[in-house]
UniProtKB/Swiss-Prot annotation:
Span of the annotated motif 'HIGH' region: 122-132
Subunit comment: Monomer.
Primary localization class, coarse: cytoplasm
Organism: Serratia proteamaculans (strain 568)
Gene from which the chain derives: argS
Alphabetical UniProt keywords: Aminoacyl-tRNA synthetase, ATP-binding, Cytoplasm, Ligase, Nucleotide-binding, Protein biosynthesis
Subcellular location: Cytoplasm
Catalytic activity: tRNA(Arg) + L-arginine + ATP = L-arginyl-tRNA(Arg) + AMP + diphosphate
InterPro entries assigned: aa-tRNA-synth_I_CS, Arg-tRNA-ligase, Arg-tRNA-synth_N, Arg-tRNA-synth_N_sf, ArgRS_core, DALR_anticod-bd, Rossmann-like_a/b/a_fold, tRNAsynth_Ia_anticodon-bd
Protein name per UniProt: Arginine--tRNA ligase
One GO cellular component term noted in the UniProt record for this chain: cytoplasm
Family recorded in the similarity comment: Belongs to the class-I aminoacyl-tRNA synthetase family.
This enzyme's EC code(s): 6.1.1.19
């Protein structure tokens, strides 16, 4: 059920009948204020300008031609030519009844696309830290949302599993005569990494040996490949524990690291040269892009192969985009990578398109995001100024949530309390991020994110349990609610109308990669239910018809909250 699409089609038909061109836009939006109706069509203004007509005159003609049947109770013209549409409460009740019994909240079937979603992308031989959080959870929310709508989603975890660091690690492991890397945990690898880097910086012979190992690794040396694979496997096994804990849907099968594209790189460089896109410049192979200028106003050079024959991230990203089209069959590729990488990605994609590796129809989208900041407005760090490990952050979240729950429910069984602390603590961290516009930086604040008031996970989880409990207390099964939904109270109508707008919200989230829009909708929905709950008797309604209708509204609210939170990867709970 998408009311906005329905009304847009109807208003567009009326505009065309009134003389507007066939490609006119109705510009139907949800009204900002109740006095302007439920929806407002603003397209008359721009169409009137094209037709050379006074906007209000065109609006009057459109309203005369507008056939909304029983959808609207009133249509009126406001201001210079805005069309305000007031929905018919009986029609709203009928649609809510239908949505309640339909699968997937009656979301319209989509024309299925293959959507590749690039997210998380931690580095091998390093523990995940807070810098990986936003990509991981925003990308996962996108994957869940697209799948719910019916698209084929391919998750791509573009892990950093190649490069100079592996030469250092292999050389250091050999130096320590410890080739049994499978016995190491990731914390050991972090220490190894630091020691290897120290040797690399301070010992010229060691650095030379490390560089030699990189060349051997790139050349397919079996010993180096075996050691490299151990390092990758240890890291990804540890990362999988973090993904599971975060309720993130990534698995080891989704790993598509930088190394996947190695075999493609020589051919791509040769092909770009053959097409005249890449040239030799000071020993390196460079693509000069007119679309980007350097500080002297000249075309910017993008290096795709260094003097020593090594490749760069850009080369890998060119291969990556090509692979995602040719091998994965992508129609759309979403990159959840921070905003600092924007120019780099744009340059790689410009080269990809110039080379003809992908068609114009393939949408490459950088869904960039800002940084997570501390209360001081600086990048979130430990008290000593170090990087915060993701595992430590989640431990603290669960611990803080556990203490809050224990204060409110001291008699709760320990096992249930731990399970609830996990759901609330992890949910709080995720929701605090997802509820902010991804394009901006946000302040990480424990007190705000764990509050039981406001747009937070604990509040939303509590709201769900409250709604679900109404239905449980009624002691009836959904199949027993056989009477039609009838609404007489304003709060019932407002809640039902907002419930019917779920499809508008989720399609916006899917199109723009904006999970905060879903969070805002769910928070608004929870607030509307709270008002309905407080002012409308449900279980003690004055008639069986009203009782069943209000139970249906409660059930539809619970279903909608659960589906919405599921698309965000936020766990719902039965008791708070």
């Amino acid at each position: 059920m998408n009311i906005q699409v329905l009304l847009s089609d109807k208003v567009s038909q009326a505009l065309i009948a009134a003389g507007a061109p066939a490609d006119c836009e109705a510009q139907v939006r949800q009204s900002a204020k109740a006095q302007f109706g439920d929806y407002q069509a603003n397209g008359v203004m721009s169409v009137a300008k094209k037709l050379g007509m006074p906007p209000r005159q065109l609006a009057e003609k459109v309203v005369q031609l507008l056939d909304l049947g029983d959808v609207a109770s009133k249509v009126e013209i406001a201001g210079p030519g805005f069309i305000n549409i007031f929905l018919n409460s009986q029609w709203v009740a009928q649609q809510a009844d239908r949505v309640l019994s339909a699968p997937k909240l009656d979301i319209a079937p989509v024309k299925q696309q293959t959507i590749v979603i690039d997210y998380s992308a931690p580095n091998v031989a390093k523990e995940m830290h807070v810098g990986h959080l936003r990509s991981t959870i925003i990308g996962d929310a996108a994957a869940r949302t697209q799948e719910f709508l019916g698209h084929k989603v391919i998750r791509a975890n573009h892990v950093g599993d190649w490069g100079t660091q592996f030469g250092m690690l292999i050389a250091y492991l050999e130096k320590m005569q410890n080739e049994n890397a499978s016995d190491m945990g990731l914390s050991d690898l972090e220490q190894f990494y630091r020691e290897a880097k120290k040797h690399y910086d301070e010992d010229a012979d060691f650095a030379e040996r490390a560089r030699a190992y990189v060349v051997k690794l790139q050349g397919g040396d079996q010993y180096c490949l075996k050691m490299w694979r151990k390092l990758v496997d240890i890291t990804m096994a540890q990362n999988q524990l973090t993904y599971n804990r975060l309720n993130v849907t990534l698995t080891e099968d989704d790993v598509m690291g930088e190394s996947l594209y190695n075999a493609m790189l020589p051919g791509i460089v040769a092909d770009l040269k053959a097409k005249g896109l890449a040239v030799e410049s000071e020993g390196a192979t460079v693509v000069f892009l007119d679309e980007y200028k350097n500080k002297d106003g000249e075309p910017m050079g993008v290096i795709i192969q260094k003097k020593d024959g090594g490749y760069l991230y850009t080369t890998t990203d060119i291969a990556c985009a090509k692979y995602r089209y040719e091998t994965l069959g992508a129609d759309r590729v979403l990159y959840y990578i921070d905003s600092r990488q924007h120019q780099h990605l744009m340059q790689a994609w410009t080269i990809v398109r110039k080379a003809g590796y992908i068609p114009d129809s393939l949408s490459l989208e950088h869904h960039m995001f800002g940084m997570m900041l501390g209360k001081d407005g600086k990048p979130f760090k430990t008290r000593s100024g170090g990087t915060v490990k993701l595992s430590d952050l989640l431990d603290e979240a669960v611990d803080r949530a556990g203490k809050l729950i224990a204060e409110k429910n001291p008699d709760m069984p320990a096992e249930e309390m731990q399970s609830l602390a996990n759901a609330v603590g992890i949910g709080a961290v995720k929701y605090a991020d997802l509820s902010k516009s991804r394009t901006t930086d946000y302040i990480f604040d424990w007190d705000n994110m764990l509050a039981f008031e406001g747009n937070t996970a604990p509040y939303m989880q509590y709201a769900y349990t409250r709604v679900a409990s109404v239905f449980k207390r009624a002691g009836v099964d959904e199949s027993n609610l056989t009477l039609p939904l009838v609404m007489t109270e304003e709060r019932e109508i407002t809640l039902a109308t907002r419930l019917l707008q779920f499809e508008e919200v989720i399609t916006t989230v899917a199109r723009e990669g904006t999970p905060h829009v879903m969070c805002s909708y769910l928070y608004d929905l929870a607030g509307l239910f709270s008002g309905f709950y407080e002012h409308c008797q449900i279980l003690n309604a004055d008639s069986e018809e009203a009782r069943q209708s209000r139970l249906k509204l409660s059930l539809l609210t619970a279903k909608t909250l659960k589906v919405g939170l599921d698309t965000l990867g936020i766990e719902t709970v039965e008791r708070m």
